Amino acid sequence: MEDSAQDAVTAAPSGTPKSKLETLPREDLIKFAKKQMMLLQKAKARCTELDKEVEELKSKPVDGGTDDMIKVLTERLDALLLEKAETEQQCLCLKKENIKMKQEVEDSVTKLEETQKEFEQSHRNYVREMESVKNELIAVHSEHSKEKAALQRDLEGAVHRQAELLEQLKSQSDSEDNVKKLQEEIQNITAAFEEQTSCLQKQLEATSDEKQQEIIHLQKVIEDNAQHYQKDINTFQEEIVQLRATHKEEVNELMSQMETLAKEHEAAVNKLKENRVTLCETSETIPENYQCESESLNEDTSDASQENQKCSVALQEDPFAEHTVYDKVRQLEDSLKELESQHSILKDEVTYMNNLKLKLEMDAQHIKDEFFHEREDLEFKINELLLAKEEQSYVVEKLKYEREDLNRQLCCTVEQHNKEIQRLQEHHQKEISELSETFMSGSEKEKLALMFEIQGLKEQCENLQHEKQEVVLNYESLREMMEILQTELGESAGKISQEFETMKQQQASDVHELQQKLRTAFNEKDALLETINRLQGENEKLLSQELVSELESTMKNLKADNSMYLASLGQKDTLLQELEAKISSLAEEKDDFISKIKTSREEIDDLHQKWEREQKLSVELREAAEQAAQHNSELRQRVSELTGKLDEILREKSQNDQNIMVQMKTMTEDQEALSSKIKSLYEENNRLHSEKVQLSRDLEALQSQQDFAYKEHVAEFEKKLQLMVEERDDLNKLLENEQLQKSFVKTQLYEFLKQMRPSILEDNEEEDVVTVLKAVGESLVTVKEEKHNLVFEYDARVLELERRIKCLQEESVVQCEELRALVRDSEQEKILLRKELDEVTSTKEALQCDILEMKNTNEKTSLENQTLSTRVEELSRSLHSKNEVHNEKDLVIEHENLRLSLEQRESELQDVRAELMLLKDSLEKSPSVKNDQLSLVKELEEKIESLEKESKDKDEKISKIKLVAVRAKKELDSNRKEAQTLRDELESVQSEKDRLSASMKEFIQGAESYKNLLLEYDKQSEQLDVEKERANNFEHHIEDLTKQLRDSTCQYEKLTSDNEDLLARIETLQANARLLEAQILEVQRAKGVVEKELEAEKLQKEQKIKEHVSTTNELEELQLQFQKEKKQLQKTMQELELVKKDAQQTTLMNMEIADYERLMKELNQKLTNKNSKIEDLEQEMKIQKQKQETLQEEMTSLQSSVQHYEEKNAQIKQLLVKTKKELADAKQAETDHLLLQASLKGELEASQQQVEVYKIQLAEMTSEKHKIHEHLKTSAEQHQRTLSAYQQRVVALQEESRTAKAEQAAVTSEFENYKVRVHNVLKQQKNKSVSQAETEGAKQEREHLEMLIDQLKIKLQDSQNSLQISVSEFQTLQSEHDTLLERHNRMLQETVTKEAELREKLCSAQSENTMLKSEHAQTMCQLTSQNEALRNSFRDQVRHLQDEHRKTVETLQHQLSKVETQLFQLKSEPPTKSPASSHQPSKSLRERRTTDLPLLDMHTVTREEGEGMETTDSESVSSAGTHIQSLEQLLSSPDSKLERLTEASLWHTEFTKEELAEKLSSTTKSADHLNGLLRETEATNAILMEQIKLLKSEIRRLERNQEREKSVANLEYLKNVLLRFIFLKPGSERERLLPVIDTMLQLSPEEKGKLATVAQGEEESASRSSGWASYLHSWSGLR
């Protein structure tokens, strides 16, 4: 029994794997060792206490009333065990219900999340629709303004042309008559022109009114839609609020339930731990106690035997001594029984608690495994996300490079366009000057013709303007399409990201399920995969870092090269500096965005497709632009022609200048008033911008205050948490001290009892023990009450802290509401400011209309407008610069604020994550501290919720700021457009002034200023594009951050749900433990009552014990038998333990050992059940004792009834026989258990074989993995080789660029030297006279410099080409890198799919194996049945064959007889006959042939070798030609009469079975005999067949001889025919003889053909001579 107890104790730790203790850190091992030492000390103390109790029990005088006490206690213990089982079942039910409730809650949460996602999507769609409508309105407004500007420019061009024509007409006004006529004509033309202009203005006004009405209508529609959407949103928000309220209530209820369950679970866990400790202690002390008891019993038995020997002598002398001996024996027997019952109870408790311990350890292992696998899954997902982010960064870099290339191409095209415009203007001016010179010599008659032509050309100009407007509209529509495509790209990217997240979640769930299925078998594989992923991630990071560094270095080098090349051009220095600044800023932004922008893989494909579409659109746009440029060139040519013709007419308008001057004065006054208004509007604009800046600063201050307040709250919470942890530690220390005091008090009590024993009498001993026990119970109750009080105090403190936290949360919510109110106020102020801006824009539009009206008068004011134009230019520049500065400052401030807020958020999130990781580590390391850290987790949850709220508020603020920025940009655009219109007006005024002064130099200066303005406009547009790109990048970055926040929240929600599950389990265990404590208290109370009752019953039983003396001897015999059986059981237990040790040595896996130990524990439980049966037998023995008591009473009353007593003894002996039989049954059961163990061993071996199979599969999988790794290594090496090659190319290109730089430096130095020389030459030329001509040296230097400039241009082009080549090579490198990454990902996916397929194949193979087994069994059954059927059918066929054999034999006999007669007749005939005598049998043969065979055609039958005119020895007739029947054919045609007779004879009579059997035997014998005869006949048949062949050959020879004799008879006729054939000339007569020859000779078709050719005369005479002479000798038969 000692070994069994020790094995039961050691079984629990052996089930757990040893690797986990080895993997623990040093601190945890030290803690674990300390805990084990504490447990050992407690066990030792408990052992000492139990030893003391045993000694006390031994020293006590045992009364007879203990039996009833033991019965009651056993019954109570049984009831307690039943209650424990019931409580366990209730716990299981509660767990199942809890799981169901959790599932329902998760389902409801998923539904709510889905509804929230749907609502968010609908809200996003509404917002996008609103933005699209706004964009459309803005586009319409911009189109309207562009149309206005175009019309204004056309009007200005017409005015300029009129002014130029007037100037030209002044110079040619020679005669007054011509001038008068021209003035009249010009007045008519001007009236018509003014009418046309008025009509155009009216049309413009009408179109503007219509557009305004449309805009108003669209605004109304937008407002209606906005109201409708707001109503829908409000309804949805109300529904969401209701759902949230219901969800919160449900969650609160569930949380309350979970808390209660968690508390109960914690209590139960603590109780179970205590019980486990106590049971371990008791299990260790039980074997020692049992040894002590067994030794004491042996001593007692020895003493008792000696005393019995003594007493037997004394009893013979004294009857009183005999009575005392019997009393002592009874006392010893009672003590024995009590000890045995206690031993069995302790055994049951030990086994039960061991089972509980194993269950709890398995649960803990399961929880740890689940946590470990979840952690691995999260790490795997993180690696996947990092890979996706890196891939997306590469794609973004590609798109940026492509965009930069497109921008460069656009800049080049714009520059080329500007150059072409300049060339056309110069050409136009030259043509105007030439036409003006030629026009002076023209005649007056051409003027009238030109007038008509001018009218036609005006109409053509109008048509061309309409066409130009259509082209502009098409271009704007294309731009709108591009913008729509960009918006659609953004939307599709969002949708794709959502779909990718859902796909990720689905994949994560699928992967989680697969991992749960395959964790036991593929742990090593998971470790390998983790290492592979880590190495791949590091490799990719290193590659990306190397690529980024190389790219940065190459980019910097290229930028430096570009700056050096562009520095050589002096005119573009300023542009290069600005571009370098922009490029540096873009590079910094690029580095930032590369680290931040990381999206999914599927977006890459969509972006590539859309990029291709955009390229196609850009190509189409370029083609359209080229067409427009061609159209513009054609228009310019026409305009040049028209201007030449209009020059003559416009000279007559010189007189109208005086009137125009008067009107110009009025215009100047109006313009001054307008300038004052513009100044006031700009001041209002500045004021509004300053207010915006103040509002943004206030918002930043509020945000900073809020963050500071949150940080203070967090610090306070952390301090409170530290205080709580310290208090918890103090309470734990107090509890430990109290437990030590309890143990000390118990030891003192036991010592006190030992001291008091000798002085107290036997009667008073029991009362003192009861009093001490009561005092101990009362002390225990007080201690428990103190424990409960402490727990309640701790709970109250926790509640107070929770209340404080809630108050702080409410305060934070109030602060958030206040901040939101401030934000709303600021938004309202912004709305008011926007309204004011709208009013200002309306006033601006009105002013623009006024300006349009005043433009007609502006044409006359030329001299006084110079001062005004300068003032207006200065004002416009200053205002434009101020606006740009303010807008840039605002944008910079907003971006900095956004960056600061995002950095703060990221830092907070990192802090929270760090705290969560610390909590996880602490939970993993110390599971006993989980209950204490619940408050920490709750507070962290609250912090995270508050941070999430802050992030949401900040996101809303950021979105609002974005909207404000977009509006500000739009306002900037409108302001810039207005400034451009003002500049265009100023330029027109300057051009008018220049033309009035008639100086071409001033006109050229105006054109140059116009070019500068266009360049500035291009710069501003580029700046706008850059700012738009920055805004888009920031938006993408914010979207990525929001996605990361969502992912982190999802992970946090999962962790919180896991923590809640753990809390619920702990609470249920606590509740169970509390219930058990209450039950124990009730049992203790009942125990006290029972002890009192036992004391009363003891007095009654002392009298009855004296009567049991007679039955003690029989009981002793039974006890001896019982001990023997116990020894046998111990032997069996030892054997089982040996078997267990052998199994432990042989087994390979710890889990299988644990299963085997569980089975062994079940067997132990069965043994304990057997022990309980034995106890039942003992109870039956007690019942027999009661019967014996009744017999003793009868003995006192009736001593004479001894015979009746003997009968009762016989009955008792029968009962003993029954018990022996039951013991034999128990032995048989033990043998059955041994057989079960053997079967289990067989199953273990089978499972080991399966494990080996699985190992083989694992080895195969690992080999495949190694192959894949090698393939990956080879691909990586190839990639590195390509990278090295490309790096070498880059180095070569860098060297070329350096050489180019050196050459450029040399050229620049030469150019500077040339400048110095030119400067010196110019100084010398100034000193010389003006009349001297230029020297030839200067011309040579100029030519040399022009050559150098051409060479430099060529070098620049070469460098640009090399740059383009390097860029293309870089793109190819990137594409190859992307393809390699895709291959790598495909390989990973293929490995995963292959694993899944192999597993599916395994499952399918197993299922197919089972199916094949079942099919094999079915086919075996079917084959057996078929075999039986075939046997029967073959028997029937054999019978039929035997019958047919008989028939054939009879027919053959008849045929043989016939054949023999025929042969005899043939032999009797003579072999050689004369021709006359042989003619008769030939006739008979022929007649026979005619009857048997069909008629033969002589034409169709071919000759054989011996036929014709050859000898008679050779055979000429073929077997097919003769058709002689063979012997087999003759035999197969029997007589019908004989067949009928045989059939009639066979089927005539029916016989009995016996007769049939006799006939069968006789027929078999006859069949054998007939078989022999058949063989003999077959041999004779063969001989006969040979003879028949000889006879046939002879018959054929004779027939041929007869035929030849016939032919010899016909020789004379044939001779005559042949002679005629020979001697006739070739022609028709010969051809007539051919059929006769054919019938006579029976020619073959080939011979016929030859004769036909001879008859026609184609053969020669030589062929004739070799005709039939050779046949004559053979026919005679002499050869």
Swiss-Prot record:
InterPro entries (alphabetical): GCC2_Rab_bind, GRIP_dom, MT-Golgi_org_protein
Biased composition (Polar residues): 1474-1483
Region (Mediates interaction with RAB9A): 1569-1679
Region: Disordered, residue numbers: 1-23, 1466-1522
Mediates interaction with RAB6A, as annotated region: 1569-1608
Gene Ontology BP term (one): protein targeting to lysosome
Domain GRIP: 1604-1654
Residues modified to N-acetylmethionine: M1
Top-level taxon of origin: Eukaryota
UniProt-listed Pfam families: GRIP, Rab_bind
Annotated Gene Ontology cellular component terms: cytosol; Golgi apparatus; membrane; trans-Golgi network
Domain comment quoted from the record: Extended rod-like protein with coiled-coil domains.
Name of the protein described by the UniProt record: GRIP and coiled-coil domain-containing protein 2
Native source organism of the sequence: Rattus norvegicus (Rat)
Gene name for this UniProt entry: Gcc2
